[in-house]
């Protein structure tokens, strides 16, 4: 499929900006889910072409990224940090003055939970509650599709599984090895109208593409959910997932070293609907994250122009011409 991008723009994504600013070396995470790869690609392009930074992308996941910041003070920037999944380890870093949240990278935020296909919910409405699922495990193919290791949602879901004694009800927990296999398991089931039960979050291509129904886990209990964010906690409980703040976080050293870039990152916010539409374009066009970043920058100057200072805006506009 023809990509709606230019060769020059894609080359610019892989080449640091000219020596046009005082920004030095910067490290930024890239998590292994679609929206985050787009956020990272957009931020990288702006930092390099608008601010002259030399950007290193660090492949990571939520928990390893927080651990790395705690132990090494790097990477400088953690993009798309899902606060509900980051756990107490991240909050301790804030208390210690090592990191600072700059702002919401998704507005109003994300949604996460345990889901079944809507066609399954319509056929078996009892499956819309966790009690109904556990009473009828065969209707969900006796399987729960869990997050990969290293994801914050894996910790929370593991604790929920223990608190519910889910496996005792006859449901096997399948721990996916990657976000790609988790997504493909949903896609394969929905396309064949087969049962599927598992964790997912949005904005994502699958939740935008497929009609899914959230399984009710009960009331949201802040203290229980906070406890469940700690791996292998002694007293896990059952709580619904709350609305999810999704942030950009930086080390305090980076904010002091590169205040203008930090200011830009504090304004770098995607409307959740905009991100969903961008991911849908990315999927339909079979595009890479870099190509999606180019597509966004070429078609949404009214959004990103307010993120940058005057000099950076002028530099970036000249690249996009």
Where are these regions (language model features)?
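Gram-negative bacterial Sec-dependent N-terminal signal peptides
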Residues: 1-20
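Short, well-ordered beta-strand elements
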Residues: 22-35, 53-58, 141-145, 265
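An extracytoplasmic/periplasmic, membrane-proximal ligand-sensing/linker region
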Residues: 35, 162-169, 176-193, 198-199, ...
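Ligand-binding cleft/hinge of the Venus flytrap
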Residues: 43-52, 137-172
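Ligand-binding pocket segment of bilobal, Venus flytrap-like solute-binding proteins
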Residues: 67-69, 75-79, 153-230
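A conserved helix-loop-strand patch within extracytoplasmic ligand-binding domains
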Residues: 99-150
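A bilobed periplasmic-binding-protein/Venus flytrap-type ligand-binding module shared by bacterial periplasmic
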Residues: 112-122, 245-257, 280-281
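C-terminal lobe and pocket-closing loops
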Residues: 206-269
